[in-house]
């Protein structure tokens, strides 16, 4: 008979431990960078689209990296750092934020930040940072601006696991590929 390779989920949404993530369920972010850390060691980054859900996150980029995450989580902790603005380095983002705060000096902090990202995400991040979003922009402290920029460049997400096979788009494993003729899809083992 055929050799069977262990089956596993390959393209599947990622579950998160972060309770605040539920507050941003339904938000889709485009062109962000996701960098996984396995036991504190940086891994290969991925860029693209992410959808936040009530359990964690999904979307093309997340699905594409889920197999790697699944392998990593078997051997330790996995944290994914989100860079919400990968096209801007830290200093360029600082300059952009400073310009927005000056231009809208009488507006509230969360109103100006909502021009850069969805309001629900702004609210969640400011809550994590313990910064009052209703603060007028002219009163935002320098250390708060620095904390906001740092957070926008590295939002930590703590992975609890992958959703099961019932949520997987694709699974891996099954009949060993070396035992199948790809041109005809016939077995090489059983004539």
Predicted regions: what they are:
Residues 123-191:
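A glycine-rich dinucleotide-binding beta-alpha-beta segment and adjacent secondary-structure elements
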């Amino acid at each position: 008979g055929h050799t069977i390779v262990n089956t596993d989920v390959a393209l599947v949404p990622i579950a998160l431990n972060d309770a605040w993530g539920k507050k941003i369920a339904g938000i889709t972010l485009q062109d962000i960078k996701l960098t996984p850390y396995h036991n504190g060691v940086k891994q290969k980054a991925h860029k693209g689209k992410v959808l936040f859900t009530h359990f964690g996150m999904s979307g093309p980029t997340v699905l594409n990296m889920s197999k790697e995450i699944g392998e990593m989580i078997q051997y330790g902790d996995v944290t994914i750092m989100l860079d919400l603005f990968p096209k801007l380095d830290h200093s360029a983002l600082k300059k952009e934020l400073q310009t927005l705060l000056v231009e809208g000096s009488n507006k509230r902090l969360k109103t100006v930040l909502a021009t850069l990202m969805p309001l629900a995400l702004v609210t969640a991040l400011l809550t994590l940072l313990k910064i009052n979003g209703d603060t007028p922009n002219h009163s935002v402290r320098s250390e708060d601006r620095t904390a906001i920029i740092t957070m926008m460049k590295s939002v930590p997400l703590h992975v609890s696991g992958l959703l099961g096979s019932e949520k997987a788009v694709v699974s891996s494993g099954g009949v060993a590929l070396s035992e199948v003729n790809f041109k005809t899809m016939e077995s090489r083992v059983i004539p």
